[in-house]
Amino acid sequence: MGLLSKKTKQVEIENFPPIGGIMVSKMIIEEHKKPMFMYRNKRDNVNDSGWRIFSGFESDEYTEDPNNAGIYAPSTILEIDPSIAELLLQGGFGSVFERKSYQSPWYRVTDFPLEDDYMVRHRLTDRWELDINNLFERKIEEDGDLLYTTGDKSLRIAIWNCENKTKAEIYAEKKQTVANRDESRAKTLKVFDFSDEKIARIGYMIKESDERREYNVIFGSSIIDNQEIFIAFYFDDDENLTWAIETWKGIKLIG
């Protein structure tokens, strides 16, 4: 586990984003205990945030009884403990946090088992497949791109046909683009080349930001003759660089 440390703006409870309902132990709601442990499952529906919050005093028997928890709006739990506001926004599906006392900081937990946390294989086309964690939600966007996201990590995929161009030709064009990109808005932090005999892979990493936070972005290409898969990875934590690289390599040819 590691100490949670983020550079984000203070969240206003009265203007808290509509993330969906939160399942909260009644020890918190009715017995007025503070949250001490929380995790985020893959949500059941669009009205479910996926968050499950506990006081840390619940027994297994208590937790297994559905009558001992309820679904509440974020504002209800934030009135009890506003310290979790940033966690509710920062933590994607699969996130787990705990703290040792009411006064101590929250820590990210990395060894708590979640039922939806396992790898799956998705077929992208008749030639490509992807290995990715089941915690990611998948949807097709209006422009036809394929989006996978947990909330704090995202992967966007576009498949481009490049008729009458060899893998070497497409790769050379992409390499030139990376080398000559305009860095006035975002500096190139890393350049990647994971090419092998079957697939050419090239890309780069930058940082972008919105009104709340700064995050990492990797733009990459996986290339074969006549076709390119363009991939954009978005992730908040630097430690998720390994996730992005391994997921990129997990986009592979079938067979």
Predicted segments — roles?
Residues 21, 35, 116-121, 144-145, ...:
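Short, hydrophobic/aromatic-rich segments at coil-to-beta transitions
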Residues 45, 126-173:
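Secretory pathway targeting signatures of secreted, lumenal, and periplasmic proteins
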Residues 134-136, 229-255:
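Surface-exposed amphipathic alpha-helical segments
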Residues 177-225:
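Signature of long, low-cysteine stretches enriched in small and polar/charged residues
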